Amino acid sequence: MTVPVITGPTASGKSALAHRLALETGAEILSADSRQVYRELTIGSAKPSREMLREVAYHFINERAITEPFSAGAFALEATARIREIKRRGKRVIVAGGSALYLEGLISPFAELPPQNAEIRRKLSEQLADLGGELLYERLKQLDPEQAETLDPTKTHRLLRSLEIIEITGRTVTELQAKKSGEPSPPSSLHFKTFAIDIPREELYRQINRRTESMMEEGLLIEAEQLWKRYRIEIENKSLPALLTVGYQELFDHFRGRTTLDEAVTLIQQHTRNYAKRQLTFMRNRLTVQWMPADTDWTAHFTG
């Protein structure tokens, strides 16, 4: 049972492409986006429009509150069950998204990583408070450079987890994943074929800049302000990972008085470009993908 996956860096057009293909083939779309799953994050997560949601059956859009954690492991389990249920109904399904851990968990089941160790996590958290995230990130770059390239240094929950795994196991996340990928896969009725949109970097950056401007015109500032007012305490203590997201963090800093609005918008564009680079690194190093130009006859690959 082959399941097509459409991925690519943010703003590459994968959502619009998946939607068009779903309309042409009668498929349902399973979103592999770790932010679109949350109801409160709409404009900043570039969700499909209301019209698109009416036209095609989407899964994992607006299904959780930001106070409800939804891990990559939980996504992989539930997504697998839904794919099988969709197939049982005789329908096609397309997986579309660019969230690294969601994709990897679904397509290449995770290596067995150890549970959190409270004592090691406490020690690392103290080091984070004393030394700062930059020094811990440099430590990870020395120990596991491939994993470090896929991380946003400002999102310390994944940084701490990566260092914690090294301390617990004596092995890096990259080593553990490589060991897993070298083992025989358990029998499964699902086979994923992953296509990635290959877009020139200059064009991608132009699209990122244009999309940021469109988001601001659509009301991203108001959306971020509503989140700021409702979750100010959680934002300040970084207890809601869903809000540690490009597009919102920069506007939260604007509300703190640290930047002008124009500076915040420029930072959103810059940080989104950085995020796209990390996505590309992940896709090239951790996924088996078929890169295809955006102007490819994609329909032929999904109807054959």
UniProtKB/Swiss-Prot annotation:
Assigned EC number: 2.5.1.75
Cofactor: Mg(2+)
Catalytic class of the enzyme: transferase
InterPro entries (alphabetical): Dimethylallyltransferase, IPT, P-loop_NTPase
Keywords from the named record: ATP-binding, Magnesium, Nucleotide-binding, Transferase, tRNA processing
Domain of life per record: Bacteria
Secretion signal, residue range per the UniProt entry: none
Sequence positions that bind substrate: T10, A11, S12, G13, K14, S15
Record field: catalytic activity: adenosine(37) in tRNA + dimethylallyl diphosphate = N(6)-dimethylallyladenosine(37) in tRNA + diphosphate
Molecular-function GO terms, alphabetical: ATP binding; tRNA dimethylallyltransferase activity
Binding residues annotated for ATP, in chain numbering: G8, P9, T10, A11, S12, G13, K14, S15
Region (Interaction with substrate tRNA): 33-36
Record-marked site positions (Interaction with substrate tRNA): S99, R121
Coiled-coil regions, chain positions: none
GO biological process: tRNA modification
Subunit structure: Monomer.
Similarity annotation: Belongs to the IPP transferase family.
Summary of the function given for this chain in its UniProt record: Catalyzes the transfer of a dimethylallyl group onto the adenine at position 37 in tRNAs that read codons beginning with uridine, leading to the formation of N6-(dimethylallyl)adenosine (i(6)A).
Name assigned to this protein: tRNA dimethylallyltransferase
Organism name: Chlorobium luteolum (strain DSM 273 / BCRC 81028 / 2530) (Pelodictyon luteolum)
